[in-house]
Amino acid sequence: MRKTFIIIAGAALALAAVSCEKTLDEQVIDIAPETRALTKAGGNNWITALPDNAYASQLSIPGTHDAATGDGTTFSLGKTQSLTLQEQWNMGIRVFDLRPGYKKVRKGLFKYVNELHIYHGIVETRTSFKAAVKVLSDNLAANPGEFAIILMRFENDSPLYNKRDVWNSLMSSFLTSSDFPAERRIDFRPDLTVGELRGKILVLSRDAYASAPSTGAFVSGWSHSVDGTTNAVISGRNASATLQLQDYYSVENKEAKIASIKNYVDIASAAEPGVWTINHTSGYTGTIGSDSSIKQNAENNNVALYDYLTDSSRPCGSTGIILLDHAGVRSSGSYDIYGDLLPQAIIDNNFAFQLRLKGE
């Protein structure tokens, strides 16, 4: 038997609806954008309320693209976030796109060692991979009903620190060290449930650092095409799953990007348990990821997806994982980004349709 959950005024109530019905203050009226009703932001600890036997693949999870850039970067080019990792966690973000490369760090008068550090392309953030993992681990210790997902890849654009064998060794050692506590590790399976993931950090690495993942899984078949792919693979040590994904980030055609985002929401809604979906509103317009082109893209896509998710006529279902830029930012200068409203609309979606439950 399937169960339905919806949060209204902080309580879990049954909802027997097929369409995505909204409460009165969440309905979107087809009038001028500046006067339409908006969902309320404030989504921390939303996973705690979900049933243990809900399939993780069926959840709607907000995530941040190049999440650590909000903690500070060496310069503004490539800065995709405005909030720190802690602030992102506080608003309900649970998927964090982290791009660890490595650099030499001074440990003594004449001693330097290589350490994992987070970059976006050639842009260095002010956050080490160790520090980023600690933020998530500390929050899980304080909120054991939650879980986090790290989506990572080797950011090797630095001309000085781009040796894959060095990165492989550093990452293999880190993921089996006390800096990544054993109680946070979990092997990937397609049918992982919320209960199994509580208190864990699921690591999905787009680059293989060893012959088999130390924890989590490897992701292969990534695509940056406008059409995305439904044939990528998430491979754990003992099981693998189909991954459906859209990451068209160098956006030459705004309408095509929006159509692809919506298409992958629909694909996620129709997916069977065990099939995972990762969808990106993130990217930039034009040919370079400048501050203005990233924010323009966020305005284009975040608002369009927000409107789509809060349309009461849309059939309900999972959105999968959705990564966005400038989470938590309603507007910046002349750009209406909806970075606070879209994550909450994604979170709300978990409580507006019949979750598929393992064993029922």
Task: Give the positions of each predicted feature.
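Structural recognition of the beta-strand scaffold that forms the well-ordered cores
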Residues: 57-62, 94-101, 147-152, 201-205, ...
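Short amphipathic alpha-helical segments and helix-helix/interface helices
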Residues: 85-86, 136-137, 168, 172, ...
